[in-house]
Amino acid sequence: MSASYRVGGYVVGRALDTVSPSDAKKLTDLFVAFAVIEDGEVVYRKPDELADLSRLRAANPDLRIILSIGGWGAGGFSEAAATPDGRRGFAKSAVALVRRYGFDGVDVDWEYPCYSAAGIAAAPSDRETFTLLLSETRSELDRESAACGRHLCLTIAVGADQYFIEGACMDEVQDLVDLVNVMTYDMRGGFQVLTGHHTCLHHSSGDLYRISAAAARGTESSRTRT
C-alpha cells in the first residue's frame, strides 16, 4: 500500500471485538465511535469496550486508532464551541482520553455547524466557532504530541452537501486538520426525490451533493477522503 494511500473505517466501540487481525491489516486508520459531550467535556461512556485496542495494534503496529467524537444526534458542540472556556474544556478532555487510552488522535464529527439536525443546538456563529474549536483542539494535541514524542492527528467528518460547506470556513479548517472525511454515504438517500450514486466520478453541475463543491470552497484534495 502506498504511503500516501489511506484506508479508514469507523467501528462502534461495542463492535471492536469483531474487528479481526486481517481487518486491521487492511486499514491505515480506524475510527472508534463515539465519544460524546456531557456537561461541556468529552467522555467515553463504556471504556471497557476499549480493551481490544491493544489486540488490534499488535495485528497492525502502523494502524492509527482515532477517537471519534459526536455522530448523528450528538449535541453539545455548539455550546462548547461558543466560549473560550468551553473550547478549552472540550480540547483538554478530548486529549485526556487520547492520553489515557493511547489513541493516535481525535476525529470531530459535528453534525452539523449552523444546522440543527436531530434537534441538537445550532447557531449562526457556529461557522466561526467551529474553526476556533478545532484550533484549540489542534493546539492541545500539539502540546500532548510534544510530551509523548509522536504526532497526534486531528480529523473531521463533514457533510456531503452545500449546507455543511456554507456552515464552515473550510479554507481555514483544512489548515488545522490532517484529514477531511466526507460522508459521501449521505449524498443520496430517502430524504431526496431523485436517486443517484454515492461517491460517483461525475456529478451534475447543479448538484449540491458533490465533492467538487467542497474543493471549490478551498478544501484540498490531498486532505479529502471519501
Residue spans of the language-model regions?
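Glycan-recognition patch characteristic of GH18 chitinases/ENGases
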Residues: M1-V98, Y115, S125, E136
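Hydrophobic faces of well-ordered beta-strands that scaffold small-molecule active sites
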Residues: V7-G9, L30-V32, I65-I69, V106-V108, ...
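Compositionally biased, intrinsically disordered low-complexity regions
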Residues: V11, W72-G73, D107, H198, ...
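Surface-exposed acidic, glycine-flexible loop patches that form ligand/cofactor-binding
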Residues: V19-D23, L56-A59, R99-R100, R143-C148, ...
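Structural recognition of alpha->loop->beta junctions
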Residues: S22-T28, V32, G86-W110, A168-D186
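Substrate-binding surface in catalytic domains of secreted glycosidases
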Residues: D39-D48, P113-T226
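Short secondary-structure junction motifs
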Residues: D62, F103, G149-H151
